[in-house]
Amino acid sequence: MIWLNGRLVAREQAHIDPADRGLLLADGLFETLRAYRGHVFKLEDHLQRMAAGAAELAIPLPLDPPSIADAVRETLAANQLAAADAALRITLTRGPGQRGLLPPDDPLPTLIISAAAYHPPPSSDGFVTVTAKRARRNEKSLTARLKTLCYLDNVIAQTEAEAAGADEAIMLNNRDAVACGGRSNVFAVIDGVLTTPAIEEGALPGITRHAILALCKSERIEVAERAITRAELRKAAEIFVTNSLLEIMSVRQFDGADLPAGAVTRRLAGAYSGLRP
C-alpha cells in the first residue's frame, strides 16, 4: 500500500499525473527513513529537513509535519510493518504544471509515502569503496545542501562503483576535495582526529551525520568538519560511511588500499545503537 495525496491506495492503483514536475524536472524532495520494530527513527528530524528544503524551494507542504508523521505510521500499519524493521521513503513534488521551467502560480504538491521490510546488508567485513571519476558534487550549488529528487550524479557514481566491484562510490567536489559517498556521508580518522567533509564541501547535511557529530561530543571524541583531500583519505587510519539505513558502515577498502575496522568506528557504532528506539 502507498500513501498518496491523503489516502492509502494499492501500489498498482497509485497514479501520478504525467505533468508532475517531480517526474519531468526532478522538482521535489525526498527523505529515506528507517523503522525499528515499527518505531521510525529520527522522524521529526527528517520532517524538519524536508520542511526546510520545501521552504527553500517554495514548495508548499500539503500537510503539516505532525500530520505527515501520522501518515507515515498509517503506511507502516497498512503494510503489516507496525512491529517490523522497515525502510520508508517520503517523496514531495511541486505537483503538475504547465510546460516549461517556471513553476505554477498555485502549485498542488504531490506527497507519496512508501514502506517495505528492511534487511541490513552484512556488515562484518565492511564496504569496498572507490573514487567516482564520472560524477562530482557541485559544492557551490544550493541543491547540494538539499535532498532533492535530482540524484543522477549519485546514480552515475554508484553505477560506476558497482562496475568496479565496490559497494560505495566516494564523490569529489569541483575542487577535488571529498564531498560524500554516493548514498552516504563520509567520516575518516586522519592524524588521530575524526574528520568529515564540511557542508560547504558539497556534503549533504545528513540526519545520521548530525547524530554522529552529537555523539562525538557526548563520547568526547575529537571531530573536525573541513575539506579532506583524496590523498588524506587514502592515508586515513579508519573510514566509515553513514546514512539512515546503513547507520555506521565501516570501510575495509578505499581505492584498493585495505583498512582495518578501527576503535573509533566500533565505539561510535556501539553508541549509535544505543540511540535506536
Give short role names for the model-derived ranges.
Residues 1-170, 174-175, 204, 213-277:
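Conserved alpha/beta cores of soluble small-molecule-handling proteins
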